[in-house]
């Protein structure tokens, strides 16, 4: 029933052809298109994301990193060039990038968000624990490792209690 909204025709009591369904879902989810993104904050987490080639399988290609640390600006991390944050607006305009990945320190999160929105970014993948504020048309996807860590601890506690009760 959940798949009744797709434009594919399934067969009664048989379902959908697997290959066609996978192709349709990949297209629908945007995995078949190439979405270029800039990464802001090339620290430990940012560097890890730059090195993650698996993101390309899902249509995301990080084409540049931005930071303020002089020791990293002008270098490449996993083949991705790192620029000074002062070049951000110019490069967003020149390259037409609409997606930014935010991995900056907590105290910089909202300021950097405001700067990205002013420069034309339309979607933010936010890895900071800060719930950033943006104007309505800007898409924000919050990914909090801390929230997921708390969830894991809660699930572990529940599982361990279940073991004791069994």
What would you call each of these model-derived segments?
Residues 53-57, 116-119:
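Short, solvent-exposed amphipathic alpha-helical segments in soluble enzyme
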Residues 36, 62, 98-100:
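Short active-site oxyanion
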Residues 45:
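Hydrophobic/small residue at the entry helix of a nucleotide-binding pocket
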Residues 76-165:
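Phosphate-bearing ligand-interacting subdomains
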Residues 1-37:
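HTH-adjacent hinge/linker in prokaryotic transcriptional regulators
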